[in-house]
């Protein structure tokens, strides 16, 4: 079998005006998420695997027994488990005019997220989701020419129809050939490290601390205080493999192997782009394949934005301790995090307030690369226990979200009984 040494020029995919208009028509329409994530139930093992996939060894998440002695009375999941664990919701078929456009062949990446958490996910919980488009914005991007910005709402709830979290994911779609022609990042070089450089990184790892069982009370927090320093990196292909092992990255495109990959190519052919050997491979490999990343105008493979979201969440949960509650986190992915890059995460308290029974701490944090570039600025709000009650308050979702979750779970059960 001959193996070609070069690949054909990738097929050019551009936006269709009718797809853009269709997306605009669907803003505010909720739909059941009928495609499962890699895992469907938050078992002790899936919770542990997800936490470890981004480097988190918090016993609240990785030890099935540790949480029994805490206010949660059991093992709970780390904040972003929803990106790897969700069952398919059974739902009535959507009319063609209400189906979201696929934008096949168009490159997509996550530019930022805003997430609010309402209650813990426990071992044994099954998660479901519904969502919809919050807005549609067409613009000229400095990186890729014509681009489409789509904030997507994702509401996650459990088997009791209780809203667990609401997440708005800012996705950006770009035309691949335009990205290549602009070549904005051509001067960026891959990071290299001396033994001394690596020793400095290891010093930060060795000094990291987790608050754990030592309760951090709201009264003891001072505006201006630092949350400390965490390091992540240098980023390796191994990191991407391990992150996938936690469950992320398999929906909606379902990268797979063997006969399953053949079947997937029949389903979404434009998602497969020939590699240097002439073999169709997933466009998702931009996250681990330098050659493919360079072919679309990027200096090299880069991470998923959701990985850095997990890093930021790791930083916050380490600081707040077992008794705290991460109420909200909002991030922006302003620059790519390339293979070999190292990030230090820092943050400080910028405010304190009381809302009802919630004792809240507002935080600004960010991830800064070895180029001294802030690639992922973020804000967060943490609910901490006060000394009088001893408990961190949890927020309540809106009645509308509760109603939609109950309706969708009811229909899911009805269709399953047929």
Regions found by a protein language model. Name each.
Residues 84, 116, 170-172, 230, ...:
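Residues in well-ordered beta-strands of folded domains
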Residues 2-112, 178-323, 387-418:
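Hot-dog-fold acyl-thioester-processing enzymes
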Residues 111-160, 167, 224, 324-370:
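Hydrophobic beta-sheet segments that form the core/acyl-binding groove
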Residues 135, 171-173, 234-235, 351-352, ...:
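A short acidic/small-residue loop/turn micro-motif
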Residues 147-157, 167-188, 381-386:
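Flexible glycine-rich active-site/ligand-binding loops centered on an Asp-His dyad
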Residues 164-167, 228, 376:
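A structural microfeature
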Residues 348-353, 365-383, 392-397:
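Charge-rich, low-complexity intrinsically disordered segments
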Residues 136-139, 251-255, 352, 385-386:
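Short regulatory "switch" loops immediately downstream of catalytic or recognition motifs
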């Amino acid at each position: 079998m001959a193996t070609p040494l070069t690949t054909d020029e990738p097929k050019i995919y551009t936006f269709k005006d009718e797809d853009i208009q269709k997306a605009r028509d669907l803003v505010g329409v909720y739909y059941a998420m009928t495609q499962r994530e890699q895992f469907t139930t938050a078992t002790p093992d899936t919770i542990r695997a997800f936490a470890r996939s981004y480097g988190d060894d918090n016993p609240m998440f990785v030890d099935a027994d540790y949480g029994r002695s805490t206010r949660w009375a059991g093992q709970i999941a780390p904040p972003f488990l929803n990106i790897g664990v969700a069952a398919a919701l059974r739902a009535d078929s959507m009319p063609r005019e209400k189906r979201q456009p696929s934008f096949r062949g168009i490159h997509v990446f996550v530019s930022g997220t805003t997430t609010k958490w309402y209650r813990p996910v426990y071992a044994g919980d099954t998660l479901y989701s519904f969502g919809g488009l919050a807005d549609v914005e067409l613009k000229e991007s400095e990186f890729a020419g014509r681009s489409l910005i789509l904030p997507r709402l994702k509401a996650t709830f459990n088997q009791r129809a209780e809203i667990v979290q609401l997440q708005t994911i800012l996705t950006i779609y770009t035309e691949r050939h335009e990205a290549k022609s602009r070549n904005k990042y051509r001067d960026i070089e891959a990071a290299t490290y001396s033994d001394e450089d690596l020793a400095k990184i290891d010093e930060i790892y060795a000094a990291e601390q987790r608050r754990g069982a030592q309760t951090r009370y709201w009264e003891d927090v001072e505006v201006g205080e630092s949350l400390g320093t965490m390091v992540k990196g240098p980023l390796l292909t191994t990191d991407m493999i391990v992150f996938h092992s936690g469950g992320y990255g398999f929906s909606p495109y379902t990268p797979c192997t063997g006969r399953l990959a053949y079947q997937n190519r029949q389903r979404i052919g434009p998602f497969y782009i020939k590699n240097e050997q002439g073999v169709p491979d997933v466009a998702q490999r931009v996250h681990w394949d330098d050659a493919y990343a360079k072919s679309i105008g990027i200096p090299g493979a880069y991470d998923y934005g959701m990985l850095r979201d997990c890093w930021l969440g790791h930083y916050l949960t380490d600081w707040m301790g077992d008794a705290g509650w991460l109420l909200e986190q909002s991030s922006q992915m302003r620059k790519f995090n390339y293979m070999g890059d190292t990030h230090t995460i820092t943050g400080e308290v910028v405010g304190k307030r009381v809302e009802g029974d919630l004792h809240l701490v507002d935080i600004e944090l960010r991830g800064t690369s070895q180029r001294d570039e802030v690639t992922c600025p973020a804000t967060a709000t943490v609910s901490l226990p006060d000394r009088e009650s001893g408990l961190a308050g949890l927020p309540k979702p809106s009645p509308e979200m509760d109603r939609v979750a109950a309706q969708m779970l009811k229909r899911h059960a009805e269709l399953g009984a047929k």
